[in-house]
Structure formats: C-alpha cells, structure tokens
Regions:
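Conserved beta-strand-loop-alpha-helix hinge in the C-terminal portion
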Residues: 161-184
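H-loop/switch region of ABC-family ATPase nucleotide-binding domains
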Residues: 141-143
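Helix N-cap at the start of a conserved alpha-helix in ABC-type nucleotide-binding domains
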Residues: 118-120
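Catalytic Walker B motif of ABC-type/P-loop ATPase nucleotide-binding domains
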Residues: 107-111
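Q-loop/switch helix immediately C-terminal to the Walker
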Residues: 35, 42-54
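Conserved ABC ATPase "signature" region
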Residues: 49, 61-78, 97
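Conserved ABC ATPase signature
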Residues: 82-89
Length: 231
C-alpha cells in the first residue's frame, strides 16, 4: 500500500514520517529525508554495490541490482562519475536507490519526487508500486496533487495532526486545491506585495475560480495558463 501525506508547508508531514519511522524496530523500516546526506566520493553504482554487500547480497547479485537501478532511474554518470559531480536530481535518485537495493518492510520517504524530472518521476513511482505490490508499506510526503492521486490512500496534515484520510478522490474531491485550503484552514488572499503590482493597473491577478484579464484561465497551483504558457 502507498500512503501519501499532503499538506501546506509546516503542517507536520516530515514530523509524522519521522514519528512513524521511530515506531519500528531497527531494520524493519527505512527513512529517506528531503535532503539526504550520502557518501559522495564514489559513483552511484559503487555505492549501491557496497550497500548490497552490506545487506548480505551475493557479490554478483549486488552488482546486478546496482546496474539495474542506475539504468532504471537514469542516473547520469551512475557508473562512471563520483556522486559529488551529480546534479540535484541525480543525487536525489541515488539516495532513493539506496533503499531500493533491498527495501525494508516499511519505507518512509520525504518528498521523494522533488527535484527529479518527469520521466524519472514516473520511473520512481513505478518502482514504489512494485515494492508496494510485494506487500511493503510505502509512505511518502508530497506537495503535488497528481502524485497524491496515485496513492492508495492519503492523509491531510494540518497543525501536526491528521485532519482527513482516505482514498484520494474521496478526500480531495474534484477540486483538490480548494479542498486542501478548507482542510488546512489556509487562505488564498489578495497579494499584498504592492510594489510588484502592474503599474498600468491591469487586473491580471489570478486565483481559485478567477481568470486573467486576457481571459486565459490560470491554475493557482501551477501558475500556468490553460494553454501551457507561464503567466
């Protein structure tokens, strides 16, 4: 089962992940923080191979899994360059591969899809689904409604508490942005940064249910117009 934690910044998603992780006996769970710290002097392949051996995998199997993960996650330089040279996205994918080499029964991943490209995101979600299908419990935090909707269940966090839980569609309905504001007690008010206002006075402000003056509907969650152009 894949459970997604969703909520505004500071709502308690990371705290909940840590608390859940701490309830397990050593070795029964793995936790990957939002900003993981991993060895950087070796390549991803070498690191994964070493960790596989630490997990008592046979040498050939550890090497095989390391090779597959570097390829599956498209880690650029995964077999040839030190992790210290990686981009933020490839660094993040390497950190996730560490728990994929031999997953524990419970995985707690804080913003695992942040900073990775769209294709890598789909690949990571596919791996998480495979792990879940093997009977493991996967819990992730996310700010992305499209990711939350792919989870089996979600928990909405507010003020360090779970304020709603259940199937994504049942909890968030057809308007996730507005529903999250309601559950979180948040507001989408007028922008107070008056020095950034249009000097011509044109009404180009956008928000839930609003349209720009040009009539191009804009998503408050992404800032993109309906035709894909940024405002």
């Amino acid at each position: 089962m894949i459970t997604g934690l969703i909520g505004i910044n500071g709502s308690g998603k990371t705290t909940r992940l840590k608390n859940l992780y701490a309830q397990h006996a050593p070795g029964a769970a793995q936790f990957v923080p939002d900003n993981p710290i991993i060895p950087i002097e070796v390549s991803a392949h070498e690191l994964l191979h070493r960790l596989g051996r630490m997990h008592r995998l046979p040498r050939a199997e550890a090497k095989r899994r390391a090779t597959i993960l570097c390829d599956e996650l498209a880690i650029d330089g995964g077999t040839t360059r030190a992790i210290s040279t990686y981009s933020a996205g490839n660094y993040k994918k390497t950190a996730l591969a560490i728990v994929f080499i031999k997953p524990a029964q419970h995985l707690y991943l804080d913003e695992p899809l942040e900073m990775v490209d769209a294709i890598s995101r789909a690949r990571i979600l596919r791996i998480l689904r495979r792990i879940s299908n093997l009977g493991h419990q996967v819990t992730i935090s996310t700010q992305d409604f499209t990711i939350a909707e792919q989870c089996d269940a979600i928990e909405v966090m507010a003020d360090l508490e779970v304020v709603a839980e259940g199937a994504p569609r049942a909890v968030l309905g057809g308007d996730p942005f507005t529903r999250l504001m309601e559950l979180s007690g948040a507001e989408f008010t007028d922008c107070q940064a008056d020095w950034l206002a249009d000097p011509g006075g044109a009404n180009t402000e956008v928000g839930p249910g609003l349209e720009s003056q040009a009539g191009s509907e804009t998503s408050p969650a992404t800032g993109l117009a309906a035709d894909g152009r940024g405002e």
